[in-house]
Amino acid sequence: MPTASMTPNPFLSGSPEHAAAAGPLAAFAALPTGMQLAFAIVLGLVVGSFLNVVVHRLPIMMKRAWLAEIAEATGAPCADDSLPARYNLCVPRSACPHCGHALRAWENVPVLSYIALRGRCRHCRTPIGARYPLIELASGALAAGALALFGPSGAALAAFGLCAALLAMSAIDMQTGFLPDSLTLPLLWAGLCVNLWGTFASLRAAVIGAIAGYLFLWCILWLFKLLRGIEGIGYGDLKLLAALGAWLGWEALPQVVLIAAVAGAAVGLVATWRGRMRFEEPLPFGPFLAAGGAATLFFGTPFYLLLGG
């Protein structure tokens, strides 16, 4: 819960009383509710389109950096020279990953372009993964949810930023099995900065949450390693739970972990029962932590309280 402070909270300044200080946010707050919601959905769709770029390119960029470091250390030529010299989240233009056809502007329109193209590349007719419209739609829904919960305020923007990062990290974890430090660590620091004003938790609770989140899964990791001889959880998951603790405070961590554990176990059992995976096969835990964090952000801690927490 946000705590009272003598310093005005810039993340909660969407009300008319703060209109003079809110700048563009005040103009947005003055719009009819329907227009606010429509704008939030469009913003979410656009951000979702960019998240697809992050999900596709960031693992490639990291792999390229690793190969370059190996080549530098060993003196061998870089093993991957198939990409352009400049390859990042901004350049080159988006292209079909199969044929390399550069996408036109209208082919980048979120969701609608997927429908217009009937889910296939216009050039090579290779099917486009359903992940692209799903991430865009999820991002739009999360933006609308943040606006509905927090109103036209900086808190809504911060909440949507958290959800967008969780969405991208979940997709990357499902695709590659790892959570990039370039996303988890900035998310942790962002949570501490946002809670300087007690936006989602007091700063004290946020700092304790970051420490407790990391140490809790660290203990689980080493306990599993002592009992089974293997690491049952990745270090990226430790950093993600620390980031969620920094955003939501230590009080929210039991519910986040509970939701993640129950959802992960349920999905794992169903996937094993249907033959989609072997019992001993690892299941990425990041998406379930992200789901627990998002559920706690939007709904508070009623599930934990119902269980007697």
Swiss-Prot record:
Disulfide bonds: none annotated. Its cofactor is Zn(2+). It is a multi-pass membrane protein. GO terms for cellular component: plasma membrane. GO terms for molecular function: aspartic-type endopeptidase activity; metal ion binding; methyltransferase activity. Its EC number is 3.4.23.43, 2.1.1.-. It catalyses: Typically cleaves a -Gly-|-Phe- bond to release an N-terminal, basic peptide of 5-8 residues from type IV prepilin, and then N-methylates the new N-terminal amino group, the methyl donor being S-adenosyl-L-methionine. It comes from the Bacteria. One of its GO terms (biological process) is methylation. Zinc is required for the N-terminal methylation of the mature pilin, but not for signal peptide cleavage. The chain crosses the membrane at residues 35-55, 147-167, 183-203, 207-227, 230-250, 253-273, 288-308. The keyword Chaperone does not apply. Keywords: Cell inner membrane, Cell membrane, Hydrolase, Membrane, Metal-binding, Methyltransferase, Multifunctional enzyme, Protease, S-adenosyl-L-methionine, Transferase, Transmembrane, Transmembrane helix, Zinc. It is found in: Cell inner membrane. Plays an essential role in type IV pili and type II pseudopili formation by proteolytically removing the leader sequence from substrate proteins and subsequently monomethylating the alpha-amino group of the newly exposed N-terminal phenylalanine. Belongs to the peptidase A24 family. This is Prepilin leader peptidase/N-methyltransferase. It comes from Burkholderia pseudomallei (strain 1026b). The lineage of its organism: Bacteria, Pseudomonadati, Pseudomonadota, Betaproteobacteria, Burkholderiales.
